[in-house]
């Protein structure tokens, strides 16, 4: 697998990775006035469903999706109201390409627990894939509004990418800038923010992010090519030559190398 494809796959997996972690005994209350559910409060059926879901999570993380799905079904047969099981079922269906079933599962998880930020994020990202951008934004905002949510950078990134796909460059820049503020070392954030800034004609800021990215081990054909395009727009021939040498040396068979050889800077 090429480094470019690995980067793209890592991006897609990263956007959902934190959502497949095993649920803990203590769970977020469904409303701000509800108390936290701790181990002593946990009914027997809920405990059994949680253990099944934890087992399913292990299978899911090993790539054994159908086995995980079977465990999830047993968890939900025990306790149909256990939101984390519905969220994990959505991830399993998503991996299997069952977009409609995945959407139904994420929606059920959010309905059961409106403060399940991971499920809201997943539903938002799936809606983005389905080009339902308005609903995607609703769910991203829901996730970001949950107090104590620890994956805000991931959601701001997804929201920014989704806004860019919808054609709202200003909103994309705002979300991606927030993602960068929270996670400045993330190469996917840097690349997508630079791409949006380039599209808006803000070449100096795009250059800043690409200098950091292309000077790191995370540089790939896409980031180098974008860097070349930025330097070309800024009239920096030395920068163009330097990045072009890197692209030809490190990614000689890439589509970006072919564009460089054609001088197709505006494709």
List the predicted regions and their residue ranges.
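TPR alpha-solenoid repeat register
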Residues: 85, 119, 126, 153-155, ...
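Terminal, low-structured helical/coil segments at or just beyond the last alpha-helical repeat
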Residues: 27-40, 215-267
